[in-house]
């Protein structure tokens, strides 16, 4: 349990992140730029690159090294990105996405395989350049680097499209679907790599992961989607509004996010699929979507993107 001083430090950190993110997001919006640019830049300003270099004492006060406070902040930012992908999923037009599934798939394969092959080849032939340890398996290390280079920044892509009002467009959906397919492939490969590093059988692990993930997507987008479509009118009219429907969306989103995280695939994929399944319902009111959108994109999402900037230390990385 956090004591009084840790609670104070945590609240100061959150308040500072939200304040600077909002100010810089408004500046970017004024110049017709996506607000995410301001939010990430806010993290860079507040992080070790700027504030930490100019005023180490102030940086240590605003973002203390206390492990408990750090853990809580990491938990909040993880929750934030899960909620963001849930909201992104609500905006996806499933029928339009299915019509352009081939374009999304081929784009994803091209966009994933090129950086994977390049990263694998470089890491395999020049492992010292990537800091490979002497005891590391060269094949596993090269697979790891190739996979890391092939995974896109899905939350950043999604938020940028949302800020530019392109999320519901044809090109926006193809971009989102391509990034989603590519990242799914990347996380599945990561689960195989972890199996190769341990004592389990990578082949069995890969087959199980693909089977469970494929089953999850099919179940969520066919029978569960239909059940949700029938349940939403009841939730929006018979239970306290908007509390009832919001609780339902978040509970289902968090449970499915937990499931995909347990599979070894990132939690954001479970949340995104739930968002798609719920958002496809004709009964989900625009008011409900707007409440979710405003709540997540103005409170939680900025915390996640600021946290990205906070992890950047240009002086340390390029020294």
Language-model features, listed with the residues they occupy:
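Structural signature of hydrophobic alpha-helical transmembrane segments
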Residues: 3-17, 68-85, 137-152, 208-220, ...
């Amino acid at each position: 349990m956090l004591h009084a001083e840790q609670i104070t430090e945590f609240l100061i950190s959150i308040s500072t992140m939200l304040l600077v993110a909002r100010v810089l997001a408004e500046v970017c919006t004024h110049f017709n730029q996506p607000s995410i640019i301001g939010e990430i830049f806010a993290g860079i300003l507040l992080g070790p690159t700027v504030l930490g270099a100019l005023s180490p004492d102030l940086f240590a006060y605003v973002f203390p090294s206390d492990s408990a406070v750090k853990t809580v902040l990491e938990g909040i930012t993880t929750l934030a990105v899960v909620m963001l992908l849930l909201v992104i999923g609500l905006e996806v037009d499933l029928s339009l996405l299915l019509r352009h599934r081939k374009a999304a798939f081929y784009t994803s394969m091209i966009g994933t395989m090129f950086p994977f092959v390049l990263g694998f080849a470089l890491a395999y032939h020049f492992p010292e350049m990537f800091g490979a340890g002497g005891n590391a398996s060269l094949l596993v290390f090269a697979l790891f680097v190739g996979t890391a280079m092939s995974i896109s920044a899905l939350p950043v892509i999604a938020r940028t499209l949302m800020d530019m009002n392109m999320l519901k467009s044809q090109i926006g959906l193809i971009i989102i679907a391509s990034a989603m397919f590519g990242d799914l492939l990347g996380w599945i490969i990561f689960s195989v790599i972890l199996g190769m590093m341990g004592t389990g059988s990578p082949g069995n692990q890969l087959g199980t992961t693909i089977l469970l993930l494929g089953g999850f997507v099919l179940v969520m987008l066919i029978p569960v989607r239909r059940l949700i479509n029938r349940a939403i009118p009841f939730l929006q009219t018979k239970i306290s509004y908007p509390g009832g429907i919001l609780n339902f969306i978040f509970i289902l989103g968090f449970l499915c996010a937990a499931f995909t995280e347990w599979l070894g695939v990132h939690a954001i994929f479970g949340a995104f699929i739930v968002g798609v399944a719920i958002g496809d319902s004709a009964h989900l009111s625009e008011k409900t979507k707007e409440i979710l959108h405003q709540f997540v994109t103005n409170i939680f999402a900025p915390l996640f993107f600021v946290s990205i900037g906070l992890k950047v230390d240009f002086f340390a990385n390029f020294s």
